[in-house]
Design a protein with these regions (language model features):
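Two-component/phosphorelay signaling modules centered on CheY-like receiver
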Residues: 14-35
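Acidic, metal-coordinating helix/loop segments flanking the phosphotransfer/catalytic sites
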Residues: 35-55, 119
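C-terminal output helix
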Residues: 113-124
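Active-site residues of response regulator receiver
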Residues: 58-59
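Receiver (REC) domain active-site loop signature in two-component systems and cognate sites
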Residues: 62
Length: 130
């Protein structure tokens, strides 16, 4: 299945980016995913691209500008506040979940460690770009 709407995916972990790409291939999905390393790069991307992504995915633990700070900045910005933001992170901490929900995250998912579980993550992102 081909999806033309862009996903901006912020995660500094190369292994996780590989998991995302491999899970997408295993599902036979053609997704337009742009990977960046941190929140600062999210805003650099948004400020330099003509097209706003349909979805932003954030890890919480990133250098320079972490996922919480990035989410807060996005939701306070009139230009970007309506873009759905999904958190995909290693933290299952209830406080992190509550903070992200309060800041406006559309969905909070804990990173898995297998291809089949990563495929479930990808399937949960698709409704935001369909």
């Amino acid at each position: 299945m081909t999806y033309t709407k862009k996903i901006l995916y912020a995660d500094d972990d190369l292994d996780d980016k590989t998991w995302v790409s491999e899970a997408t291939e295993l599902l036979n999905y053609q997704l337009d995913i742009e990977f960046v390393e941190n929140g600062r790069q999210v805003f650099e991307y948004l400020e330099t691209q003509m097209e706003v992504p349909a979805l932003i995915v954030l890890d919480l633990n990133m250098p320079e500008l972490d996922g919480r700070q990035t989410l807060k900045k996005l939701k306070l910005n009139n230009k970007y506040k309506n873009i759905p933001v999904v958190i995909v992170t290693t933290s299952a901490n209830k406080i992190d979940v509550e903070i992200c929900n309060r800041l406006g995250a559309s969905l909070y998912l804990v990173k898995p460690d297998s291809h089949s579980e990563w495929q479930l993550i990808i399937k949960q992102l698709v409704p935001y770009i369909s």
